[in-house]
Amino acid sequence: FIHVEGVPSKDFRQQRIDLSSYTAVIFTSRMAIDHYFRIAKETRFSVPDQMKYFCVSEAVSYYLQNYLVYRKRKIFHGRQTFKDLMELVVKHSGEKYLVPCSDIQRKNIPDQLEKNQINFKNATLYNTVCSDLSDLKDVKYDVLVFYSPSGIQSLIKNFPKFKQNNTKIAAF
C-alpha cells in the first residue's frame, strides 16, 4: 500500500541542515540509516569517525555495520522503544543530535527530546508515499493487514468506494 522515496539532495539542501555541525545521530529505523548515508554521499559529506550513533534497538545498531566499523564506544542502542533510548540520550545531553526521519514522523520523538532539553534537529530524508494500486480494483482479498496508518490512508486514496463486506482487516 505504501513505499518510501528518498528526498532528493536538492530538497535536502533547502532544509538548511549542515551535517558537519552535528556530533550525534539518532536512528529509529534501518530506513533512516540508509537515507542518512545516501544523503551524506550525495552531498559529499564525509562522516567523521568521532560521530556518535544512537539506535532505537540492537538490530538497528547492527545494521550500521553496512556503512561503518562497529565500535561500542560510539554506537549506543535502546532495548526496543524510543523511551528506552532516551535514557542514553539524556546521559549524552551535551551532544548536538540529528534525527533522520520521514515526512510523517511520530510526534512522541521530538516531544521527548524537547521535554529533556536535548539539542536536536529533525532532517526529513525520505517520504512515505501511497503506492498506485489502481490495477487491483477487481481483486478481492480475505484479509488486509496494515502496519501503519499510512497503509490505511493509501487504501482510502486508492479505493475511495471501498466496502469491507467479508474482508477481515488486521492492524499491527
State the predicted function of each range.
Residues 1-172:
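Signature of uroporphyrinogen-III synthase
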